[in-house]
């Protein structure tokens, strides 16, 4: 069964096993780790473990490794390296082709192809696929498609082997192949730092490791330039639109230097100048800083300052008495408006740009309804939008009008290389007279640039949001910069209306925002604190609340309850919470299929969240013929069916049904628990907030607590440490964001 190559490593004998893959017991799609059952050359069955990217049934393999004894599973062959050989026997070829590798070839057709062409099968698939049409039932078109798929699979397997050999995630394969096709390996060998492109989301050190393995110079211009671009791009995720040059130089030199290699500031400055000359960067003195921008960020910020300043100065004249119209409308309205609400409605009628801000219970929604009534009376065609699907649905429910996400409004799509493009733009503007945009605190400057670019000339824009909530995940602090620039007419609603005063959720949200401790409700209230400290106790209490106590005592279904946490991994973060909640709310069952992907098990009935924008996913409306494309970051759905043979699953997002292939599962996370950041823009009947010890201090801030509280409509339960709650209330630090939008708006006013 085995032979060995005559050497030892670390006192272990390294042996060689040759065999054919009979069963794939376990496969991790993210890193290619697998447990295989092999039929060895002498007929014995071998269990092998190791990294086998894109391994298929029927493949002949040569494994190098050693025997180990697993405490549960017994003797296994731990593989250190392997070579693959395509099968040469008719049976092996049929098994390989019929394993689901190629869409349209099942076991029967695979057997026919193998029998017809024998050991020449793979050569024909690669070079003469049209010959497949010699078989009954295969058209010329199908033959070419089978050949295309086989060629693509072969090229992707080579790429996977290259990535695996160099310790890079094999999950990069489809991304690299989609952009670079069969030239991916050559491109990586020429410039490993292309992996630092945000499209691939690879840590710089991994790309650096590949460069060192390939023998490239660690003082090369390519490495320095890549380090600068990586640092600037990485800091977009921290909300910065630029970085002061002195901080950039320090960060780049730290990134690129070690005990053996020193990259000094002079070399980094030359890199900045080089990239500026190529048009990749902009260096500018603004807001009292020597600022370095990525070109796109600079252009977005400058464009917004120019356009918003222009819109803020635009006033509308009418050939009738607007005050009389407003007075008549407000008197006849079913709503009663405060003086500030009336001021907001009047300002929106007269100005090209207006901001409406305020906390919970201050009447923002009622004011929006009043603005809509006035816009209708003025004959304006108005569109409603919000950053996320849930926020758009909530806006639609509250106003009775259709509301779309910004991406849907602008008809977003993908260009080559994964770039987002919008069909609506200055050359194809929106068909409207006004846009009302809700939850503006979530919107970063790049998305805002796209919206402003798509507004028709003369259109009004009403921005609605709570400036005390979390800033956007992306670059900039758009809403706060606009308000503090004092360039844009802003109405801040501060009066808490009587009905809202009856809610302890609303009153405690305002208390926290003012730096005061929240007060738990009495027995019939809507705000409770359950004191627990250690993560295990918090997580178990949360699971009991969701599975038993809240459904039993309040009648909430699990779908009406959302668990929130400030963090993902630490303490009572969403990852350990989701594992326990899945176990409590959707345990394994013979009637439910499941798919393991990395460390996550996806099961029929699971609640999941899309964690990146995907403009290509096709969806159908339930009970309707309507079709569309695109599922976006933050969309929450339920897995309704898993199809192992077809390697796909079907997910329902509200009234839309979408199919995900298994190689797309890196875009999904379990969503029984989500971070407070991910929850922004949504409201839930019941919120359970997990605040154990051990959460990262940088996430224990007042505005995170305030944002979490304001997600709850009918019930909020904090399960956690009193000390953590107190720390968050007293911690009013807001992370510094380097942005010059406010400075540009003020500068434009003086010119």
Language-model segments: residues:
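Loop/turn positions that initiate beta-strands
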Residues: 58-60, 605, 634
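Conserved helicase motor core of P-loop NTPases
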Residues: 467-629, 640
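Short aromatic-glycine-enriched beta-strand elements
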Residues: 27-38, 645-650
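Pre-P-loop entry segment of helicase/translocase ATPase cores
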Residues: 164, 233-237, 280-343
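Accessory alpha-helical DNA-binding modules that contact the DNA backbone or grooves
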Residues: 12, 33-41, 47-48, 56-288, ...
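ASCE P-loop NTPase helicase motor core
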Residues: 242, 342-345, 350-524
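C-terminal accessory regions
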Residues: 622, 633-751
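Structural detector for short beta-strands of small beta-barrel domains
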Residues: 13-28, 65, 636-640
